């Protein structure tokens, strides 16, 4: 693949190259690593140990303002009224005919502050267009947020060593704002692996290399390996991927 300026490089791009990424695809207009060793080797690392993924391609969409909740609810048929601050929920985004525009994980970061973590597709453009004619007081924009996924049965040990016991005790689909060595983060008990895992949302792209290296060093005692989202494990786990398994016609 030829790298060019029309596609975004993640804050972890240089780190992934140093750690052996040898193939990339374009996902949400971002280069995403698809292979370091082999899909099979990465599968066994995922199910036996722990892996670190660069998933900056999950380009976050922030929705804020007094009408943020009402706007979120307009985008999905799922009842979001029970989503508390600090909680995440899976949701499908639908158009006026009920067609699935995308699927996403919603993170409620604050009382009137939400992040959408979508699959592949121009969700930011779509949501911005919906907001224009909604009559609601909301802002829709892309924040400076870049996620990593820490996935595998040993992920809780790495998270504990990085953040403390609260990371092990965190409930599934909940989040916490925190810092690591002064780096601003949001950590959630979510992932796309069918294994135990976390997503670590970097809130300042300047710390990409530093955060990647910090997590990899913490994972050494647990045989951590860099990896790509694993199709084998996603099929085993029954997890759907937008475009591959879900389309606007569904």
State where each predicted segment sits.
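Short, acidic/polar N-cap/turn motifs at the starts of alpha helices
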Residues: 58-60, 90, 103, 145, ...
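Conserved, structured C-terminal
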Residues: 1-34, 107-250
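Acidic active-site catalytic centers that drive phospho-/nucleotidyl reactions
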Residues: 54, 103, 199
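Acidic, proline/glycine-enriched N-terminal capping motif
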Residues: 1-91, 99
């Amino acid at each position: 693949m030829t790298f060019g300026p029309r596609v975004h490089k993640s804050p972890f791009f240089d780190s992934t190259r140093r750690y052996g990424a040898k193939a990339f695809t374009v996902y949400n207009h971002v280069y995403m690593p698809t292979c370091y060793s082999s899909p099979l080797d990465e599968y066994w690392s995922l199910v036996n140990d722990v892996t670190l993924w660069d998933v900056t391609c999950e380009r976050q969409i922030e929705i804020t303002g007094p009408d943020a909740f009402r706007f979120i609810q307009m985008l999905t048929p799922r009842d979001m009224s029970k989503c508390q601050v600090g909680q995440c929920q899976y949701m499908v985004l639908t158009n006026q005919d009920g067609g699935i525009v995308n699927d996403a994980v919603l993170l409620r970061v604050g009382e009137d502050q939400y992040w959408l973590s979508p699959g592949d597709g121009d969700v930011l453009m779509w949501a911005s267009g919906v907001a224009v004619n909604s009559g609601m007081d909301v802002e829709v924009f892309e924040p400076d947020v870049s996620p990593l996924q820490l996935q595998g049965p040993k992920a809780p040990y790495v998270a504990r060593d990085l953040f403390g016991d609260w990371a092990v005790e965190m409930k599934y689909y909940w989040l916490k704002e925190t810092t690591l060595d002064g780096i601003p983060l949001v950590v959630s008990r979510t992932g796309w692996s069918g294994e135990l895992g976390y997503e670590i949302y970097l809130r300042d792209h300047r710390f990409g290399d530093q955060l990647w290296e910090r997590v990899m060093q913490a994972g050494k005692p647990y045989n951590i390996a860099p990896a790509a989202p694993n199709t084998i494990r996603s099929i085993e786990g029954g997890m759907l991927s937008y475009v591959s398994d879900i389309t606007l016609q569904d």
